[in-house]
Every structure is written in structure tokens, then in C-alpha cells.
Amino acid sequence: MRTSRECGRFAPTRRTIAVVVVAILVITLAVIAALLLPRPFEPAHAEEVQGGLDHPWDIGFSDDGRMLVTERIGRVRVYASGEPGAGLLHTATIPDVRTELESGLMGIAVHGDAVFICASRDTGNDWNVELLRSTLAADGSLSPFEAVPIGEMTGAARHQGCALEVDASEHLWLSVGDANLPRGENAAQDSDRLNGKVLRVELDGSIPADNPFGNAVYSLGHRNPQGLAFAPGGAVWEVEHGTDENDEINLLEPGGNYGYPCFTGADAAGPIPDVCGRASDYLAPAWASGSPTLATSGAAFLIGSGWGDWEGDLIVSTLKEEDLRRFTLNAGELTLEQTLFDRRFGRLRATVMGPDASLYLSTANGSDDRILRVTR
């Protein structure tokens, strides 16, 4: 029979038991403290407005406050308002939308009872980007969408752009990506082609008399412009994805050439001697990310006294970095001031001012996506 001394080699001593108990208590208290500690201070508040969406791309509001949301799979959802849990009034499904990688139903703009959308469509003959128009009825229903003819825009699985806005002069602005066409094809530098451009047309698709090239093109040399925003004074700002460097924010000028594929940021994107001119031929961005890129997407200027000293600042959403970036604007110069909601909600795409002076965002995580409302 083993003695108690022999068994003691395997039996825990009182000191061992005490150490274990203390360690468990320390770990438990640390976990409880972590759970009770508040989140790092956020200077803005976000709440969910709608959930359960499938790749929501953009958000628009009617004059009476109804909220319209595009889903990339080809749906437009009409809600009674931008309030949390507002009722769904209507869902419209757009035929022939081609959903592949980045393509599908994208931008939306609402002006009066007119609803404009930008979609990548394949009717079996051609794959194109199209501008479509519908009428919003009092009950929230939408008439069948019809194409607004503005010219051929090549569709593709990547680089569609498709930001839409209507300005105070009732011009419709549409950004169109370069469709990932070969750089040697130089679509973004060809003012006779609509890919790789920001377009400006009348609401019926006709060409404004003061457009710089006599067609729909307002500016050129863009890669994948997914954000358009009007500053309080009316200036138009554009946000686009770079390659592996230099996402850009540009102040648009009529006829302005923003460089792609020849120059991005302040640097050459690579020698293409047959299509590239001098660096001085191109307009430098107001801001560029350098390397790495952030995947900048939607953009909006903050309007309303509720934003305090942020009023007039530019907010840009990012997909890859999963946050918002706040920029101040002084004498035409942008300064990155702050990062908001860092990786709190995942990928962020749409950034839209609502009629209540709140900021509305869409997530782009691929499952159970949401619309968020941000206030300060």
C-alpha cells in the first residue's frame, strides 16, 4: 500500500489550489470588466434602419421622405421613410440585370416623382450599362423602368461606376467606370466614348448646351468612380477606386482630364506612350490614398446644424478598410481629419444625406446587409 507521502507527489497542495483559484478569479474579473467597459468613444451615433438586405448599393429619398434602396441583384425597395423599421411599400424587380462580381443594379437618384437608376444589363445581345427611369406613385409603387438614351456604355464584371445625382439646375450626373477594358484600348482617355467618364445630361437624356465635348461627357480619365457629391456651394466632387494604389477624390472641372490610365495620384500609372501626354495635361486629385488603397466608395457633404463643426465636411465610405473617413474642405483643399466606425459594421458603400439631415449608409458584407442612420 502507498503511503500518504508517496501519494502527495500527485495530490494538489493547498498552495497550488490557492494559486489556481486566484488565477481563475483574475481571469473572470478581467472578462467581466471587458464586457462592462464602454466601446471606444465614437463622436457619432449609428442605428440600424433596415436589415436583411442583399448587397444594397445605393439609397435615395423622395421629397416626402420615402426611402428607396437598390439591391445589386436587381431590386428597388421602397420604404415609407428612413425611420427604423419603416414599412416596405413596394419592391420592383428590374429585368435583364446582370449580376456578376461588381456588376448589377447600382446607383439611384430621386427627383420629384422621377426615379433614375444605373444598371448593368445583358439582354442576350449586348452587355451594357444603362440609365433607366421610372415614376414613383403616391402608394410607393414604381412604373416600369424605361431606358434613357445617352449613348453606349460597355458593361463588364468590374469597374462600372454608376453613381447618380441630380443637381439644383436639374442636370443628371452619372459616373461610368472604364469597364476594366485593356489599358491600351484607352477608353477612359477617349472623349468620344462614355466609359471612364463622369457624364452630365438633362433629365430626358439630352445634352446640355454647355457640355465641354458636345456629348454627355463632362470629365474624363476615370477608372472606377463610385461616388459623386455636391458641396454646399454647388461644386461637384468625385470619388474613385485606384488600382493597387491611389484611390482619388477629385474636384470636377468641365473637360477636366483626371489621368487614368496614364497618371494616378501624382505619379504615372505606367508608360503608355501611344495614348499618354505630358503630366501637365492632367488634373491632380484633391486627395489620393497612396499605397495601400482604401476602396473608397460613396460620398456626401454633411448638411445641417446638427452636425456642429462638422457641417460642410466631406464623408467618404470605404469598403476595404470598413470605415468612414471625414475630410475638411478649406479653399479647395481636402484634409483627412478622422476615421469613424472603424471595422464596426464591415464594408460600407452608400453614403447619402437624408431629408432629416441624417447620414445614411449601406453595408456591403454579402449577407444580412443593412441600412444605417448616422447622427451626431
Question: What residue spans do the PLM features occupy?
Answer:
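Beta-strand-rich domains and repeat architectures in extracellular enzymes and scaffolds
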Residues: 48-74, 294-302
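Beta-propeller domains
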Residues: 68-92
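Asp-box/WD-like beta-propeller blade repeats and closely related beta-sheet repeat scaffolds
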Residues: 128-166
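Surface loop/turn motifs at the tips and blade-to-blade linkers of beta-strand repeat domains
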Residues: 48-54, 92-100, 148-156, 216-221, ...
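Residue-level detector of Asp-centered blade-edge/turn motifs that repeat once per structural unit
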Residues: 61-64, 110-113, 166-170, 230-233, ...
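Residue position within the beta-strands of beta-propeller blades
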Residues: 69-71, 117-118, 174-176, 238-239, ...
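Beta-propeller domain segments
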Residues: 103-105, 178-338, 346, 356-360, ...
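Blade-loop segments of beta-propeller domains
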Residues: 85-112
